[in-house]
Amino acid sequence: MIKQDIFKLISDNPVFYLATVDNDQPRVRAMFLYRADETGIIFHTATMKEVHEQITKNNKVELCFSCNGIQIRISGELTLIDSDDLRNEICEHPSRKFLKDWREKGFFEDFHKSIAVYILKNGIAKVWTMDKNFE
């Protein structure tokens, strides 16, 4: 499978599971993809969440997408993107209406400091299907 096919599959199936490490304990939770293309895989979380603290301490992660019988695991290192323009772009996206509402209603004292946006560049993807299970 080529990179563009992977970007298309994960963009069409934006819910993924993110694995981090909390001291020596693995942690996994569902996340929501913002964008995946040649620049990288972008998602966000709130800075008060434990996942943000875990990534800050150890930025090596694995993302797992389930795409209609195809599992795509992508490992790599996350980089924090400090861009209010990108945070605002994310808020204006139709899939992130809840963030726009939070920003406009003052849910966070400082919205831009409360949203952490991450990018994974140059990840290593592994594609799995049941048909290829024992290969």
Model regions: which residues?
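A short mixed-secondary-structure module that forms the rim of ligand-binding clefts
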Residues: 34-70
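General beta-strand recognition
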Residues: 17, 40-42, 73, 126
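Charged, amphipathic alpha-helical segments
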Residues: 1-4, 45
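Conserved beta-strand in the GNAT
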Residues: 29-32
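Charged, gly/pro-rich active-site loop segments
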Residues: 73-135
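A short, Trp-centered hydrophobic/proline-enriched beta-strand micro-motif
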Residues: 8-23, 61-64
